[in-house]
Swiss-Prot record:
Family annotation (InterPro entries): Ribosomal_bS16 (IPR000307), Ribosomal_bS16_dom_sf (IPR023803)
Entry keywords, A to Z: Ribonucleoprotein, Ribosomal protein
Key word Heme present: no
Name of the protein in question: Small ribosomal subunit protein bS16
GO molecular function, one term: structural constituent of ribosome
Family according to the record: Belongs to the bacterial ribosomal protein bS16 family.
Cellular component per GO, a single term: small ribosomal subunit
Organism: Lactococcus lactis subsp. cremoris (strain MG1363)
Matches recorded under SUPFAM superfamilies: Ribosomal protein S16
Organism placement in taxonomy: Bacteria, Bacillati, Bacillota, Bacilli, Lactobacillales
BP GO annotations: translation
Gene name, Swiss-Prot/TrEMBL: rpsP
Pfam families linked to this entry: Ribosomal_S16 (PF00886)
Amino acid sequence: MSVKIRLTRMGSKKKPFYRINVADSRAPRDGKFIETVGTYNPLVTENQVTLKEERVLEWLSNGAQPSDTVRNLLSKAGVMKKFHESKLSK
């Protein structure tokens, strides 16, 4: 089972809000997921992102692959840097 960390669209028409979910790569975008690890609101001027950093780092260390957009959000939040530092320290 290949696991991805990706966005799931929520909110109403023309007002998107996203959850950052861990899901099987074969599941549909808004379908079944394993765990919610954060949220992303692109409509706020500062692009509000909330994350459960420990859970994201755990999923990344277990081999979950982030989508391109999620990878950018994690990089801006500093999570990818922590992940690479922990990977290099082993």
